[in-house]
Structures are given as C-alpha cells and as structure tokens.
From Swiss-Prot:
[4Fe-4S] cluster binds at residues 350, 410, 413. Binds 1 [4Fe-4S] cluster per subunit. Belongs to the aconitase/IPM isomerase family. LeuC type 1 subfamily. Its cofactor is [4Fe-4S] cluster. GO terms for molecular function: 3-isopropylmalate dehydratase activity; 4 iron, 4 sulfur cluster binding; metal ion binding. HAMAP family: LeuC_type1. The keyword 4Fe-4S applies. It is an enzyme of class 4 (lyase). Pathway: Amino-acid biosynthesis; L-leucine biosynthesis; L-leucine from 3-methyl-2-oxobutanoate: step 2/4. Keywords: 4Fe-4S, Amino-acid biosynthesis, Branched-chain amino acid biosynthesis, Iron, Iron-sulfur, Leucine biosynthesis, Lyase, Metal-binding. This is 3-isopropylmalate dehydratase large subunit.
Length: 469
C-alpha cells in the first residue's frame, strides 16, 4: 500500500516526465500564461533558435502591467519602453500563434484574473507565468507558481520545466470568520504570523473551516499572497465551490467531459495521515481587520492596534530593519492605526480586483462621499469584471461618491504605468506588496481589504470597518 500523499504530492507526481538521481525533475506544464513584461526576450530566443511555441493552445497572452487605465488608453502608451513591450507581445502572439487579449478586447485584464474567469485555470493542473503572483491559481487545487524569463522561453519551447520538489506545509485556519473580516485579513494575518520567510522552500496547502467557507474569489486572494509568505506556491483542495465556479466558464469542460473531470478533481485532496514538514494553525474566530504599517507584508497589526516599537525586538538586524521601515513610512511607535491619515486609495490588483471585491467596497461607499483630502480610484481586474460591475450599477455608486472608475489593468499595484503615488503620499491599497517604492518613488503603502480601503477613503483615515456595517 502506498504512503499517504498530500495534494501537492499528487499533482507533482502526475506531472513528472523524468526524475534524476539528485531529485531534479522535468515537469510537464499544463498551462502557460504570458504578459508583456517577462516575455519579449523569451520569444526572441525562440525566434533566434528557429523554434515554434510547443503548445499554443496551452498558452494565453494578456497585456496588463503597462497598459493605461484611463478612458483615453486606446490613444496609446506614452512611455516608450512600455509601449514597445506591449507592441512586442501583440506581434509575438500573432507570429507564434498564441491567443492574445489586447487592451481593445473586453476579456483583457490582469492575467491572474483572466485565467480563472476564462476557465483556462483548472484543478490538478501545473500552471506557470513570468509573474510571482501566479500562486493565485492554486485556489483551484492547481500547482501554480511564477517563473523567470529564461524559464518562460523553456516552457514556450518544450511545455516542460526543470524543478526540484519543495517541502509540504499546512496552514489550517479553524473556526468561522467574524463579520467584516475577509480573505485579505486571513492572508495578512498568516504572513504576520509566519513572516515573509516562513514558507521558504515549501508549498503551502491552506485548509480548515475558514478557508472552506471562502468563495473562489476569496480563495484566490489567499493563494495570491502565498509568495509574500515566502512559499513557492499555495494550494486549496477543490470542492463543490470550485466546481460550481468552473462549470460555466468559456474554456471549461462541458457535458460528460465535465462530469468525468469533476470525478477526477474530487480525488485531489490530501490523504489522511499525509506528512507535512511544517504546520501552522490559526483561529479565525479571533481575527480582526488587518492593516500593514511597515514596508514588508509581515508588518501587520489589527485596526484596533498601534504602530509597534522596534525596540521591543531582541534580534538586532530585525530591530534595525523595522526602525528603517517606520522612518520610511513616516510613522512613530505608539501611533493608533485609526489615527493614520491617508492621501490615496487604490482598490484593484490581482489580489482584490474581482467582482466580489468591488461589491464589498460599494457596500461601504453607497450613499457616502470620499473625504476632501483623499483621491480614490477603482480599477476592475478585467474587462468582464468591469462589465459586470456596471450591470450592477457599482460604477455609479463609486462615481457618485467621488471615486475614479478606471479601465482594467495592474494599475497602481506597481509603478510600471502612469498610476503611481507621488513621493510621501500614503495609500490604503488592496494590492499585495508594500515594499519601498512599490507604488512610486518614496510611496507609502498600507495593505488592507477592499472594505477597509473603501472606509478609509470616506473617513480620510483608517477606521474599523466592523463599526460601519
């Protein structure tokens, strides 16, 4: 009888083409997502070598990082480097026979939102992209992670990837989530608990009652930020919630094929007694809304809390690092989180740019006005998200409140397009990284949920969203 296996073990074993004595494996890759920033050199490598794309139907190209999100974006991209990258992706996709969603296509959006909503992402698959937040797709019970540009070329050419297997880690979130506490709060709390190196060398499986209670969109938020916890990838075993989400998607299996697929997908769960190299358990019942205060995703606290004092940290290097973070963020120890005033609000990104995220924000915003001291923007994660939001009248709620309503793209998550903070500006952001300069030179980023960001836009400072329900 074979030893019990984890979900990660099962997907890995199913995709090993060759295994060397030192543990190095050649893995078959089911899906390859491509965007404009990490693909130009890869396609050029194919061109020079005279190689075709091995499996065009298993490859999907989407423009997202550099595209403007303003209404006039079809007039062109002003930044020359960004424009060249976008034009190169369009040309490469055409030349190599890869399906491509341009900024003129309503299916266009952030690659990690587009994949799932098209049914390109399915349980049990191996999925890669030249982007660190590819872990998002693990919400479907897929093994998904980012790769470098040379690896992008390797996958384009061979539909395989050379890898060594990571260790297994289980993060179990028990209990029921309190009202107004979200998937974003769960993952920020997890990173606060394990640190940004806590998952290094591991693939994390998320489990427990709180995880199971999440919608697919919530699960994608959790898996999206696995990389911020240091892990290679994050996984959630598929269930009826997963199957219900998938079945109506354009590229999903249909009819009898779907029934056969679901029968297989139901086997994609960890066996009882499977070994994990590391286990972390959290209690969801005690989770509050979370706000980041520093320049690392592990720098988090409750909205009810205060900015911590780095002098309380024993380890010298970490203490020095946290003092640097406070200096960069312009904060002092002991400051109440709810006393921190903000200048900007960004609701969007591959972490929180889906329809449920916009609904949560609209619920807070409805009938209220953005503070006079705040500039706020909503950037739907895809054209289809934008279309659905407009059908529901969410755009009107945001516009009436004083938010900007933008076109889809990565936007202010990262300073690679025109949406960026000015030096010293402080932003309540639903994105995934608060590094120095992430949203612009000397930008100050606080990571929060969509509801928390929306409430901060109205109040002009952080507030406990639980008091607004």
């Amino acid at each position: 009888m074979s030893a019990p296996r984890t979900l990660y073990d099962k997907i890995w074993d199913d995709h090993v083409v060759n295994r060397d004595p030192d543990g190095t494996c050649l893995l078959y890759i089911d899906r390859h997502l491509v965007h404009e920033v990490t693909s130009p050199q890869a396609f050029e490598g194919l061109r020079i070598a005279g190689r075709p794309v091995h499996s065009p139907t298993r490859t999907l190209a989407v423009v997202d990082h550099n595209v403007p999100t303003t209404a006039d974006r079809l007039e062109g991209i002003k930044n020359e480097e960004s424009r060249i990258q976008v034009e190169a992706l369009a040309q490469n996709a055409k030349e190599f026979g890869v399906e491509y969603y341009s900024e003129r296509d309503k299916r266009q959006g952030i690659v990690h939102i587009v994949g799932p909503e098209q049914g390109f992402t399915l349980p049990g698959m191996t999925i890669v992209c030249g982007d660190s937040h590819t872990s998002t797709h693990g919400a479907f019970g897929a093994l998904a992670h980012g790769i470098g540009t040379s690896e992008v070329e390797h996958v384009l050419a061979t539909q395989t990837l050379i890898q060594k297997k990571a260790k297994n880690m289980l993060v179990r979130v028990d209990g029921k989530l309190p009202e107004s506490v979200t998937a974003k709060d769960i993952i920020l709390a997890i990173i606060g608990e394990i640190g940004t190196a806590g998952g290094t060398g591991h693939v994390i499986e998320f489990a427990g009652e709180a995880i199971r209670s999440l919608s697919m969109e919530g699960r994608m938020t959790v898996c999206n930020m696995t990389i911020e916890g240091g892990a290679r990838a994050g996984l959630i075993a598929p269930d009826e919630t997963t199957f219900d989400y998938i079945k109506d998607k354009p590229r999903a299996p249909k009819g009898e094929t779907l029934e056969q697929a679901i029968a297989y997908w139901k086997t994609l769960k960890s066996d009882e007694g499977a070994h994990y190299d590391k286990v972390v358990i959290l209690d969801a019942a005690n989770l509050p809304p979370i706000v980041s205060w520093g320049s690392s995703p592990e720098d988090v606290t409750s909205v009810e809390g205060i900015v911590p004092n780095p002098d309380d940290i024993e380890e010298e290097n970490k203490r020095t690092s946290k003092w640097r973070a406070l200096d960069y963020m312009g904060l002092k120890p002991g400051t109440r989180i709810t006393d921190i005033a903000i200048d900007r609000v960004f609701i969007g990104s591959c972490t929180n740019g889906r329809i449920e995220d916009l609904r949560a924000a609209a619920k807070i915003v409805d009938g209220r006005k953005v503070a006079s001291t705040v500039s706020a923007m909503i950037v739907p994660g895809s054209g289809l998200v934008k279309e659905q939001a407009e059908k529901e009248g969410l755009d009107k709620i945001f516009l009436d409140a004083g938010f900007e309503w933008r076109e889809p793209g990565c936007s202010m998550c990262l300073a690679m397009n025109d949406d960026r903070l000015k030096p010293g500006e402080r932003c309540a952001s639903t994105s995934n990284r608060n590094f120095e300069g992430r949203q612009g030179y000397k930008s100050r980023t606080h990571l929060v949920s969509p509801a928390m960001a929306a409430a901060a836009a109205i109040a002009g400072h952080f507030v406990d969203v639980r008091e607004w329900q």
